[in-house]
Amino acid sequence: MNRMRWVGEGDIWDLDMSTPVTLEGTARAVPDDPLPLGLSRGTRLSRPKQVEFFHRFMASPLIPSFSPIRPNTGDGGGGGFSLQRVLTLPFSNNWLVSLLGQFDVQRFVTEIDKTKAFGRGSSSTVASRLNTIGKHLKDKSLYALGFCSEFLLSPDDTLLLSYDAYKGDLDKNPRAKAIFNHEFPLHNLTAEAVWPGLFVDKHGEYWDVPLSMAIDLASLPAESGPSYHLCLHHNSGSPKKLHSDTMEVPPPSLLPGLSLKSAVSYRTNMDLWRGTTPKLETCKPYDVFLSSPHVAVSGIIGSVMTAAFGENSIRSKFENDSEGVGGFSLHFPSVNSGFMADALGRASLTAQYGNFQKFFFDLTRFHARLDFPHGLRFLTGATSVAQDLLNSRQPSLEAFQKICPEVLVSLQQQIVGPFSFKVESGIEIDLRNGANPVTVDKTVFAIEYALQVLLSAKAVVSYSPKQNEFMVELRFFET
């Protein structure tokens, strides 16, 4: 219903993370200082629309997923393998209603195995076993239902309303969301209310916030030039770790309160090499955005200012700041508020071989990204190292640690035709850990199927070993 806009891989603002934990299929990054902002992401199809696409155009009547946890399962948070199916009702060209159903296959099999009819050495008849299966299929705790209504209010305005219920109970611990999006010629305006809001922190842990509301005004991603974000975020209620009975300390930014973030950045690109071999005229590339061999570098510099009012005041983040992470900061205890400003930077390298047109091995793509999210820490560390070297002194490990970037690398290789394999991983550098200063974290493996007829779209089957999650999804205009 709404036109797609391309999300560039070099854009500095974080995207929502895909996750099968909920029916909606996404989790927002926990806001931090300076990044993530908390509401900054690319346009994507809603989960019901993705599932409907697989049903209609890819001959997939059931969509599988796996997650070790599920909301409100009532069995200690256990998840497992599940299947999804959607029913859509297009009432008009401007109004689409969908009902997304999810069946917990793993729990169903587990419950069946516990019954006497399927026990070891059982002499039950076929009729008895079928009766047992039918009885368990009626167990509403095996099902989750998601109602979604999408309105195209105007060519530039959309409204999405969703209501998800688990264990077949529409009133017990539901998850609801309302999203309004307006597209200006050069900007996107998004207003969102979620109850509860699902967030994921940097350790991969999920948190529920009883009520989360946000308004985001963002300029569209550009190949080069300035961009900005204005983000107003309000939390209400005490956050709780998903499927945890213990009272754990939540990230400060999820506590009740109001925060306002203003971020500006400038991006520049430079081609080191671009292939001149003519493309095949007899066939189209599998993906138009992956059809040009090249080697390019890009850089982003920017700054973020944050004002917080309430329990989510940024004061607690600086009291425990042992590494000098925080930038310029002020705190006003009398009104329970604070202010912070910091700089940030990013450098990236992309190298691609092949036009992604031939049937075999016509695409090899490598991407490396260095993030410097705390400009003041980097500046103080670089200054300290430079002074020590000029004075013929050995720089300290603490100074070197401050200038170490956050690293993300990805490699994509065509296998056959539109199929390609992709692996993405973060690299953490901790020079103070002499035994293991470099660790690989947040690795994700994926098989991608390029949908050639849609120019730049792909069906993605991904697996995250850290979170033990498996998911099938549809993505548009993303590299």
Swiss-Prot record:
Q: Which residues cross the membrane?
A: 288-310
- Where is this protein found? Plastid, Chloroplast outer membrane; Endoplasmic reticulum
Stated consequence of mutating P20L: In tgd4-1; accumulation of trigalactosyldiacylglycerol (TGDG) in leaves and slightly pale green phenotype
Major subcellular location class: plastid
What membrane topology does the annotation report for this chain? Single-pass membrane protein
Following inactivation of the gene, the phenotype reported is: Stunted, pale yellow and infertile plants, which accumulate oligogalactoglycerolipids and phosphatidates.
GO CC annotation: chloroplast; chloroplast envelope; chloroplast outer membrane; cytosol; endoplasmic reticulum; membrane; plastid
Effect the entry attributes to changing K114A: No effect on phosphatidic acid binding
Q: Which GO terms of type biological process are on file?
A: acylglycerol transport; ER to chloroplast lipid transport
Q: Which domain of life is it from?
A: Eukaryota
Plastid keyword on record: yes
Q: Which InterPro entries match?
A: TGD4-like
| Keyword Chloroplast set for record | yes
Keywords attached to this Swiss-Prot or TrEMBL record, sorted alphabetically, are:
Chloroplast, Endoplasmic reticulum, Lipid transport, Membrane, Plastid, Plastid outer membrane, Transmembrane, Transmembrane helix, Transport
The effect annotated for K116A is: No effect on phosphatidic acid binding
Q: What is the annotated role of this protein in its UniProt record?
A: Involved in lipid transfer from the endoplasmic reticulum (ER) to plastids. Specifically binds phosphatidic acid (PtdOH).
State how it assembles. Answer: Homodimer. Forms dimeric beta-barrel. Interacts with TGD5.
Instruction: List the protein's name.
Output: Protein TRIGALACTOSYLDIACYLGLYCEROL 4, chloroplastic
Gene this protein is translated from: TGD4
